[in-house]
Regions:
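Gly/Trp-centered helix-boundary motif
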Residues: 3, 23-26, 54-55
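A detector for short, charged/polar N-terminal pre-domain segments
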Residues: 22-36
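A structural signal for multi-pass alpha-helical bundles of membrane permease subunits
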Residues: 33-316
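Short, intrinsically disordered terminal tails adjacent to the first/last structured region
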Residues: 1-21
Length: 316
Protein backbone atom coordinates (compact mmCIF):
# COMPACT_ATOMS: atom_id res chain seq x y z
CA UNK A 1 0.00 0.00 0.00
CA UNK A 2 1.51 3.23 -1.10
CA UNK A 3 2.27 5.72 1.65
CA UNK A 4 0.17 8.76 1.48
CA UNK A 5 1.99 12.07 1.95
CA UNK A 6 0.16 14.34 4.30
CA UNK A 7 0.57 18.01 3.61
CA UNK A 8 0.29 20.29 6.61
CA UNK A 9 -2.93 22.12 6.46
CA UNK A 10 -2.82 25.88 6.89
CA UNK A 11 -4.37 27.17 10.07
CA UNK A 12 -7.69 28.63 9.37
CA UNK A 13 -8.08 32.22 10.49
CA UNK A 14 -11.14 32.70 12.68
CA UNK A 15 -14.02 34.31 10.95
CA UNK A 16 -14.12 38.06 11.18
CA UNK A 17 -10.38 38.51 11.80
CA UNK A 18 -8.81 40.46 8.89
CA UNK A 19 -5.35 39.74 7.57
CA UNK A 20 -2.48 42.18 8.14
CA UNK A 21 -2.22 43.21 4.53
CA UNK A 22 -5.76 44.56 4.28
CA UNK A 23 -5.16 46.43 7.53
CA UNK A 24 -2.08 48.08 6.05
CA UNK A 25 -3.93 48.85 2.86
CA UNK A 26 -6.85 50.22 4.79
CA UNK A 27 -4.46 52.42 6.79
CA UNK A 28 -2.97 53.79 3.60
CA UNK A 29 -6.43 54.43 2.18
CA UNK A 30 -7.51 56.25 5.34
CA UNK A 31 -4.30 58.29 5.29
CA UNK A 32 -4.83 59.34 1.69
CA UNK A 33 -8.46 60.11 2.43
CA UNK A 34 -7.26 62.53 5.10
CA UNK A 35 -5.09 64.34 2.59
CA UNK A 36 -7.99 64.45 0.14
CA UNK A 37 -10.24 66.01 2.78
CA UNK A 38 -7.57 68.64 3.48
CA UNK A 39 -6.93 69.32 -0.21
CA UNK A 40 -9.61 72.04 -0.64
CA UNK A 41 -8.25 73.94 2.36
CA UNK A 42 -4.70 73.62 1.03
CA UNK A 43 -5.81 74.95 -2.36
CA UNK A 44 -7.49 77.94 -0.72
CA UNK A 45 -4.36 78.52 1.38
CA UNK A 46 -2.15 78.46 -1.70
CA UNK A 47 -4.40 80.72 -3.77
CA UNK A 48 -5.10 83.36 -1.15
CA UNK A 49 -1.91 83.27 0.95
CA UNK A 50 1.09 81.63 -0.67
CA UNK A 51 0.61 83.05 -4.17
CA UNK A 52 0.14 86.66 -2.96
CA UNK A 53 3.12 86.22 -0.62
CA UNK A 54 5.26 85.11 -3.55
CA UNK A 55 4.11 88.10 -5.60
CA UNK A 56 4.86 90.37 -2.64
CA UNK A 57 8.44 89.11 -2.47
CA UNK A 58 8.79 89.46 -6.24
CA UNK A 59 7.58 93.09 -6.30
CA UNK A 60 9.87 93.95 -3.38
CA UNK A 61 12.85 93.31 -5.66
CA UNK A 62 11.84 96.10 -8.07
CA UNK A 63 11.46 99.87 -8.07
CA UNK A 64 7.83 100.38 -9.05
CA UNK A 65 5.26 103.13 -8.58
CA UNK A 66 2.29 100.88 -9.36
CA UNK A 67 1.73 102.34 -12.86
CA UNK A 68 4.85 102.61 -14.99
CA UNK A 69 7.32 99.90 -15.96
CA UNK A 70 9.25 98.52 -13.00
CA UNK A 71 13.05 98.46 -12.80
CA UNK A 72 15.23 95.91 -11.06
CA UNK A 73 16.27 96.94 -7.55
CA UNK A 74 17.66 93.75 -6.08
CA UNK A 75 17.96 94.13 -2.32
CA UNK A 76 17.99 97.94 -2.41
CA UNK A 77 14.50 98.16 -0.95
CA UNK A 78 15.60 95.96 1.95
CA UNK A 79 18.82 97.82 2.66
CA UNK A 80 16.79 101.02 2.66
CA UNK A 81 14.98 99.75 5.77
CA UNK A 82 18.28 99.79 7.64
CA UNK A 83 19.42 103.11 6.13
CA UNK A 84 16.22 105.16 6.40
CA UNK A 85 15.88 106.73 9.89
CA UNK A 86 12.09 106.93 9.53
CA UNK A 87 11.78 103.22 8.81
CA UNK A 88 14.13 102.32 11.65
CA UNK A 89 12.07 104.51 13.96
CA UNK A 90 8.89 102.79 12.78
CA UNK A 91 10.17 99.34 13.73
CA UNK A 92 11.43 100.71 17.06
CA UNK A 93 7.99 102.17 17.75
CA UNK A 94 6.46 98.73 17.15
CA UNK A 95 8.71 97.18 19.77
CA UNK A 96 7.76 99.96 22.20
CA UNK A 97 4.09 99.16 21.58
CA UNK A 98 4.75 95.55 22.63
CA UNK A 99 5.15 96.91 26.17
CA UNK A 100 1.66 98.44 26.02
CA UNK A 101 -0.07 95.74 23.95
CA UNK A 102 1.51 92.69 25.64
CA UNK A 103 3.44 93.18 28.87
CA UNK A 104 1.09 95.58 30.68
CA UNK A 105 -2.19 93.85 29.63
CA UNK A 106 -0.86 90.41 30.59
CA UNK A 107 0.34 91.63 34.00
CA UNK A 108 -2.93 93.43 34.75
CA UNK A 109 -5.06 90.55 33.44
CA UNK A 110 -3.19 88.06 35.64
CA UNK A 111 -3.97 90.13 38.74
CA UNK A 112 -7.59 90.72 37.73
CA UNK A 113 -8.11 87.03 36.91
CA UNK A 114 -6.73 85.98 40.29
CA UNK A 115 -8.86 88.52 42.16
CA UNK A 116 -12.11 87.87 40.28
CA UNK A 117 -11.82 84.09 40.56
CA UNK A 118 -11.23 84.36 44.31
CA UNK A 119 -14.23 86.67 44.53
CA UNK A 120 -16.34 83.76 43.30
CA UNK A 121 -20.01 84.57 42.93
CA UNK A 122 -19.94 88.09 44.29
CA UNK A 123 -22.51 90.35 42.70
CA UNK A 124 -21.17 92.35 39.77
CA UNK A 125 -18.12 90.18 39.01
CA UNK A 126 -19.59 88.81 35.77
CA UNK A 127 -20.62 92.32 34.69
CA UNK A 128 -17.10 93.57 35.38
CA UNK A 129 -15.61 90.79 33.24
CA UNK A 130 -17.99 91.59 30.41
CA UNK A 131 -17.08 95.28 30.55
CA UNK A 132 -13.36 94.48 30.44
CA UNK A 133 -13.87 92.25 27.38
CA UNK A 134 -16.13 94.76 25.59
CA UNK A 135 -13.29 96.54 23.68
CA UNK A 136 -12.56 93.29 21.84
CA UNK A 137 -15.96 93.35 20.12
CA UNK A 138 -16.02 97.07 19.31
CA UNK A 139 -14.92 98.05 15.79
CA UNK A 140 -11.47 99.63 15.66
CA UNK A 141 -12.88 102.65 13.83
CA UNK A 142 -15.19 103.33 16.76
CA UNK A 143 -12.40 102.77 19.28
CA UNK A 144 -9.93 105.06 17.53
CA UNK A 145 -12.51 107.80 17.02
CA UNK A 146 -13.65 107.67 20.65
CA UNK A 147 -10.11 107.82 22.04
CA UNK A 148 -9.20 110.64 19.67
CA UNK A 149 -12.04 112.63 21.22
CA UNK A 150 -10.91 111.69 24.73
CA UNK A 151 -7.33 112.81 24.03
CA UNK A 152 -8.39 116.04 22.28
CA UNK A 153 -7.29 119.40 23.81
CA UNK A 154 -10.87 119.98 24.97
CA UNK A 155 -11.61 116.30 25.49
CA UNK A 156 -12.69 114.38 28.56
CA UNK A 157 -9.16 113.72 29.83
CA UNK A 158 -7.99 117.32 29.76
CA UNK A 159 -11.31 118.55 31.15
CA UNK A 160 -10.95 116.17 34.10
CA UNK A 161 -7.35 117.26 34.71
CA UNK A 162 -8.34 120.91 34.74
CA UNK A 163 -11.22 120.17 37.08
CA UNK A 164 -8.88 118.71 39.72
CA UNK A 165 -6.31 121.49 39.41
CA UNK A 166 -3.83 119.76 37.09
CA UNK A 167 -4.16 122.19 34.22
CA UNK A 168 -0.38 122.21 33.75
CA UNK A 169 -0.53 118.50 32.88
CA UNK A 170 -3.25 118.94 30.24
CA UNK A 171 -2.00 118.85 26.66
CA UNK A 172 -2.94 117.60 23.18
CA UNK A 173 -1.92 114.05 23.97
CA UNK A 174 -1.90 112.78 20.39
CA UNK A 175 -0.29 115.98 19.09
CA UNK A 176 2.64 116.09 21.50
CA UNK A 177 5.86 114.40 20.38
CA UNK A 178 6.60 113.09 23.87
CA UNK A 179 3.15 111.63 24.60
CA UNK A 180 1.73 110.56 21.22
CA UNK A 181 3.22 107.05 21.16
CA UNK A 182 2.44 106.23 24.84
CA UNK A 183 -1.09 107.55 24.29
CA UNK A 184 -1.56 105.17 21.36
CA UNK A 185 -0.02 102.39 23.45
CA UNK A 186 -2.50 102.92 26.28
CA UNK A 187 -5.32 102.45 23.78
CA UNK A 188 -3.73 99.11 22.96
CA UNK A 189 -3.62 98.23 26.66
CA UNK A 190 -7.34 98.99 26.92
CA UNK A 191 -8.00 96.81 23.87
CA UNK A 192 -5.95 93.74 24.80
CA UNK A 193 -6.54 93.39 28.54
CA UNK A 194 -10.00 91.86 27.98
CA UNK A 195 -8.65 89.13 25.71
CA UNK A 196 -5.92 88.25 28.22
CA UNK A 197 -8.41 88.23 31.10
CA UNK A 198 -10.74 85.77 29.35
CA UNK A 199 -7.83 83.44 28.55
CA UNK A 200 -6.55 83.50 32.12
CA UNK A 201 -9.96 82.98 33.73
CA UNK A 202 -10.50 79.96 31.49
CA UNK A 203 -7.03 78.68 32.40
CA UNK A 204 -7.60 79.07 36.14
CA UNK A 205 -10.77 77.02 35.77
CA UNK A 206 -8.66 74.12 34.46
CA UNK A 207 -6.22 74.12 37.40
CA UNK A 208 -7.12 71.24 39.78
CA UNK A 209 -8.75 72.47 42.98
CA UNK A 210 -6.61 70.00 44.95
CA UNK A 211 -3.55 72.16 44.27
CA UNK A 212 -5.18 75.17 45.90
CA UNK A 213 -6.31 73.05 48.85
CA UNK A 214 -2.79 71.71 49.30
CA UNK A 215 -1.39 75.23 49.19
CA UNK A 216 -3.84 76.34 51.89
CA UNK A 217 -2.87 73.36 54.07
CA UNK A 218 0.75 74.45 53.73
CA UNK A 219 -0.22 77.87 55.05
CA UNK A 220 0.12 79.72 51.74
CA UNK A 221 -1.50 83.13 51.54
CA UNK A 222 -3.09 84.69 48.49
CA UNK A 223 0.20 86.00 47.07
CA UNK A 224 2.14 82.78 47.59
CA UNK A 225 -0.78 80.76 46.21
CA UNK A 226 -0.75 82.93 43.09
CA UNK A 227 2.97 82.42 42.42
CA UNK A 228 3.08 78.76 43.45
CA UNK A 229 -0.13 77.45 41.87
CA UNK A 230 -1.89 79.93 39.59
CA UNK A 231 1.05 81.32 37.65
CA UNK A 232 2.65 77.92 36.80
CA UNK A 233 -0.76 76.60 35.82
CA UNK A 234 -1.25 79.41 33.31
CA UNK A 235 1.92 78.89 31.28
CA UNK A 236 0.01 77.76 28.22
CA UNK A 237 -2.48 80.62 28.39
CA UNK A 238 0.31 83.16 28.92
CA UNK A 239 2.06 81.84 25.81
CA UNK A 240 -1.13 82.19 23.76
CA UNK A 241 -1.81 85.68 25.12
CA UNK A 242 1.76 86.79 24.50
CA UNK A 243 1.68 85.48 20.93
CA UNK A 244 -1.63 87.16 20.06
CA UNK A 245 -0.79 90.50 21.67
CA UNK A 246 2.70 90.72 20.17
CA UNK A 247 1.23 90.11 16.72
CA UNK A 248 -1.42 92.76 17.41
CA UNK A 249 1.26 95.27 18.41
CA UNK A 250 3.43 94.67 15.36
CA UNK A 251 0.58 94.77 12.82
CA UNK A 252 -1.14 97.86 14.24
CA UNK A 253 -2.37 100.04 11.38
CA UNK A 254 -5.97 101.23 11.63
CA UNK A 255 -5.54 102.71 15.09
CA UNK A 256 -2.62 104.89 13.96
CA UNK A 257 -4.23 105.68 10.61
CA UNK A 258 -7.39 107.05 12.23
CA UNK A 259 -5.94 108.65 15.37
CA UNK A 260 -2.60 110.19 14.32
CA UNK A 261 -1.73 109.43 10.66
CA UNK A 262 1.74 108.58 11.96
CA UNK A 263 2.22 112.02 13.50
CA UNK A 264 3.14 114.34 14.92
CA UNK A 265 6.04 114.14 12.49
CA UNK A 266 6.80 110.43 12.55
CA UNK A 267 6.35 110.01 16.32
CA UNK A 268 3.74 107.25 15.85
CA UNK A 269 4.85 105.93 12.48
CA UNK A 270 4.72 102.12 12.35
CA UNK A 271 5.80 99.59 9.69
CA UNK A 272 2.20 98.69 8.78
CA UNK A 273 1.35 102.37 8.35
CA UNK A 274 4.49 102.91 6.25
CA UNK A 275 3.42 100.05 3.97
CA UNK A 276 0.14 101.84 3.27
CA UNK A 277 1.68 105.30 3.03
CA UNK A 278 4.40 104.27 0.59
CA UNK A 279 2.16 102.10 -1.57
CA UNK A 280 -0.78 104.50 -1.88
CA UNK A 281 0.69 107.84 -0.81
CA UNK A 282 4.15 108.26 -2.29
CA UNK A 283 4.01 105.61 -5.03
CA UNK A 284 6.87 103.47 -3.67
CA UNK A 285 5.22 100.09 -4.13
CA UNK A 286 8.48 98.13 -4.19
CA UNK A 287 9.63 99.70 -0.94
CA UNK A 288 6.22 99.07 0.64
CA UNK A 289 6.40 95.39 -0.30
CA UNK A 290 9.90 95.11 1.17
CA UNK A 291 8.69 96.61 4.45
CA UNK A 292 5.77 94.17 4.47
CA UNK A 293 8.10 91.21 3.91
CA UNK A 294 10.43 92.41 6.68
CA UNK A 295 7.51 92.90 9.06
CA UNK A 296 6.18 89.42 8.27
CA UNK A 297 9.61 87.95 8.97
CA UNK A 298 9.81 89.75 12.33
CA UNK A 299 6.34 88.53 13.32
CA UNK A 300 7.16 84.93 12.36
CA UNK A 301 10.49 85.06 14.21
CA UNK A 302 8.99 86.43 17.43
CA UNK A 303 6.08 83.98 17.25
CA UNK A 304 8.52 81.10 16.82
CA UNK A 305 10.62 82.24 19.78
CA UNK A 306 7.58 82.69 22.03
CA UNK A 307 6.10 79.29 21.22
CA UNK A 308 9.47 77.55 21.68
CA UNK A 309 9.78 78.76 25.27
CA UNK A 310 6.75 76.78 26.47
CA UNK A 311 7.96 73.18 25.81
CA UNK A 312 11.32 73.92 27.44
CA UNK A 313 9.58 75.16 30.58
CA UNK A 314 7.30 72.14 30.69
CA UNK A 315 10.27 69.77 30.66
CA UNK A 316 11.86 71.38 33.71
Amino acid sequence: MAATAHRPTARKRPAGVPTREPVRRRGRVVQWKGYLYALPALIVLAVFLLVPLGQLVQISLFHWDGISVSTWAGVDNYTEIARDPQLRAGFLHSFVLILFFSVIPIALALMLAAVTTRAGRLRGVSVFRAMIFLPQVVAMVVTATAWTAIYAPDGVLNTALRAIGLEAVARPWLGDFSTALPAVGLIGTWLEIGLCLVLFIAGIGQIPAELYEAAKLDGAGAVREFFAVTLPGLRGQITVALTLTVIAALRTFDLVYIATHGGPGNATSLPAYEVYNRAFGTGQVGSACAIAVALTAVILLLTFLITKVQPQEDET
